[in-house]
């Protein structure tokens, strides 16, 4: 997944 991607997070920021």
Curated annotation (Swiss-Prot):
GO biological process, one term: adaptive immune response
Keyword tags: Adaptive immunity, Cell membrane, Immunity, Membrane, Receptor, T cell receptor
A GO cellular component annotation in the UniProt record: T cell receptor complex
Highest taxon above the source species: Eukaryota
Localisation: Cell membrane
Function: D region of the variable domain of T cell receptor (TR) beta chain that participates in the antigen recognition. Alpha-beta T cell receptors are antigen specific receptors which are essential to the immune response and are present on the cell surface of T lymphocytes. Recognize peptide-major histocompatibility (MH) (pMH) complexes that are displayed by antigen presenting cells (APC), a prerequisite for efficient T cell adaptive immunity against pathogens.
The protein's assembly and partners: Alpha-beta TR is a heterodimer composed of an alpha and beta chain; disulfide-linked. The alpha-beta TR is associated with the transmembrane signaling CD3 coreceptor proteins to form the TR-CD3 (TcR or TCR). The assembly of alpha-beta TR heterodimers with CD3 occurs in the endoplasmic reticulum where a single alpha-beta TR heterodimer associates with one CD3D-CD3E heterodimer, one CD3G-CD3E heterodimer and one CD247 homodimer forming a stable octameric structure. CD3D-CD3E and CD3G-CD3E heterodimers preferentially associate with TR alpha and TR beta chains, respectively.
Protein name, as recorded: T cell receptor beta diversity 1
Species whose genome carries this gene: Homo sapiens (Human)
Originating gene: TRBD1
